[in-house]
Amino acid sequence: LGVLLERELEDELTHSIEELPVECRTVFKKSRFEQKKYEEIALELGISINTVKYHIKNALSLLQKRLDNYLHLLIIYIFMDI
C-alpha cells in the first residue's frame, strides 16, 4: 500500500506542478528542483525578487489546495504503519 500511495502522490504532484501557470511553474522549478536562489532566478528571468517570491507563494498555495486530499491519505497511512 505504501509504494502505491507514494507513486500516486508523486504522479499527482508532478501533474499539479505541470498545471501551474507557466511563469509560476518556471520559477517554482528553478527554486525547488534546481536549488537556485531567488536572486539568481530574478536575474535569469529578468524579473524582480518580489515577483519571484510572489510566484513561489502562489505555486505553494495552488499545490497545497490541489494536494489537500492526499494529505488525509498520508495521515491515515502513517497511522496504519505504526
Feature-to-residue mapping (PLM):
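Helix-turn-helix DNA-binding module
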Residues: 18, 22, 26, 34-51
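Glycine/proline-rich, flexible active-site/cofactor-binding loop segments
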Residues: 26-28, 47, 69-73
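Short amphipathic alpha-helical boundary/capping segments
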Residues: 11-21, 62-65
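DNA-recognition helix of helix-turn-helix
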Residues: 44-68
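C-terminal edge and immediately downstream basic/flexible tail or linker adjoining helix-turn-helix-like DNA-binding
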Residues: 60-82
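Acidic, proline/glycine-rich intrinsically disordered inter-domain spacer in sigma factors
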Residues: 1-15
